[in-house]
């Protein structure tokens, strides 16, 4: 009689684990399919940043209380860094803050940096091309 009970527990347990693994696989497949679709649509930077930080651009903007970066300007980055420093210090665990909130603030900054920096670099490259190449010539006396 005990062997029947043990066998039944093993069978039911394996069914539960099998279903859990199947569900986890479905979720992972759907997530990777979504990321591939994002990259195909031209949101490659968005997809990469979302993968690394696990946060959307809207969520990052809400956490740091900044507007969405329309164009990658230094002013946007300065505002992001200002808000980041203030919120990071306010949520310091040694001062009674929350480590979880502090990590969310860090992830939000990383997400916004991933969005703004490529635009800033592109702008700088365009400005350099516009100005032309001006080598520095050193004259001896």
Swiss-Prot record:
Residues 59-117 are annotated as: J-like. Its main location: mitochondrion. Signal peptide: none annotated. Keywords: Membrane, Mitochondrion, Mitochondrion inner membrane, Protein transport, Translocation, Transport. Gene3D superfamilies: DnaJ domain. GO terms for molecular function: protein domain specific binding. Pfam families: Pam16. The keyword Cytoplasm does not apply. InterPro entries: J_dom_sf, Tim16. It is found in: Mitochondrion inner membrane. One of its GO terms (biological process) is protein import into mitochondrial matrix. GO terms for cellular component: PAM complex, Tim23 associated import motor; TIM23 mitochondrial import inner membrane translocase complex. Residues 119-141 are annotated as: Disordered. It is a peripheral membrane protein. The J-like region, although related to the J domain does not stimulate ATPase activity of mtHSP70. It nevertheless mediates the heterodimerization with the J domain of PAM18 and is therefore essential for PAM complex function. Essential component of the PAM complex, a complex required for the translocation of transit peptide-containing proteins from the inner membrane into the mitochondrial matrix in an ATP-dependent manner. In the complex, it is required to regulate activity of mtHSP70 (hsp70-5) via its interaction with tim14/pam18. May act by positioning tim14/pam18 in juxtaposition to mtHSP70 at the translocon to maximize ATPase stimulation. Belongs to the TIM16/PAM16 family. Heterodimer with tim14/pam18. Component of the PAM complex, at least composed of hsp70-5/ssc1, grpe/mge1, tim44, un-4/pam16, pam17 and tim14/pam18. This is Mitochondrial import inner membrane translocase subunit tim16.
